């Protein structure tokens, strides 16, 4: 037996008492392998290749916010999805970044096995690195299927995490402006 993800999925199906050769499951191991490769493709991406040449000189010195960026990731504890939205903001210091790159940074880290707390920090630090901003704020609000489908089985809970760097951490007014603008 080879050592592919599909081979291991087939073994899991057998361990569950399923027949991996029945019609509905015959192609499941390969489909799952392909899905998992997509859901974890962030491991093969690096910040410079995601941002490319989309950081530009600018005199803009007011807050830039991109809110409601959809995200999904896999919980590293149970390999079950968590799904939510991410709000990012930065205070430029002579440079701005193409807005699609903010969403791509979110995806690069979300498409890995994650916990939401680390994901939030990784996104904030990457935006700070890419933009050299005066400060960065990131908030993620997500529902975790590992908590909804198993364990405590709480269907309506939503986890919120935030990371504030630079002026977003040091200046209450900057942080308050960010929080008020994402709630509009």
Swiss-Prot record:
One Pfam family in the UniProt entry: GTP_cyclohydroI
This protein's UniProt keywords: GTP-binding, Hydrolase, Metal-binding, Nucleotide-binding, One-carbon metabolism, Zinc
Reaction(s) the record says it catalyses: GTP + H2O = 7,8-dihydroneopterin 3'-triphosphate + formate + H(+)
Pathway: Cofactor biosynthesis; 7,8-dihydroneopterin triphosphate biosynthesis; 7,8-dihydroneopterin triphosphate from GTP: step 1/1
GO process terms (BP): one-carbon metabolic process; tetrahydrobiopterin biosynthetic process; tetrahydrofolate biosynthetic process
Keyword Lipid metabolism attributed: no
A Gene Ontology cellular-component term: cytoplasm
Enzyme Commission number(s) from the entry: 3.5.4.16
Coiled-coil segments: none
Molecular functions (GO terms): GTP binding; GTP cyclohydrolase I activity; zinc ion binding
Superkingdom of the organism of origin: Bacteria
Binding site for Zn(2+): 75, 78, 146
Annotated protein name in UniProt: GTP cyclohydrolase 1
């Amino acid at each position: 037996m080879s050592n592919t993800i599909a081979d291991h999925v087939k073994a899991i199906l057998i361990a569950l008492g399923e027949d991996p050769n029945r019609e509905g499951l015959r192609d499941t191991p390969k489909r799952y392998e392909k899905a998992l490769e997509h859901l974890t493709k962030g491991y093969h991406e690096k910040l410079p290749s995601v941002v490319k040449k989309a950081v530009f000189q600018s005199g803009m010195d007011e807050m830039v916010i991109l809110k409601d960026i959809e995200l999904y990731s896999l919980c590293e504890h149970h390999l079950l999805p968590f799904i939510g939205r991410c709000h990012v903001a930065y205070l430029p210091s002579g440079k701005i970044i193409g807005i699609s790159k903010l969403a791509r940074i979110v995806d690069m880290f979300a498409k890995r096995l994650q916990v939401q707390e680390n994901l939030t920090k990784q996104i904030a630090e990457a935006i700070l690195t890419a933009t050299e901003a005066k400060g960065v704020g990131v908030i993620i609000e997500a529902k975790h299927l590992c908590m909804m489908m198993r364990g405590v089985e709480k269907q309506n809970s939503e986890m919120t995490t935030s990371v504030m760097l630079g002026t977003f951490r040091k200046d209450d007014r900057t942080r308050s402006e960010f929080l008020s603008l994402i709630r509009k």
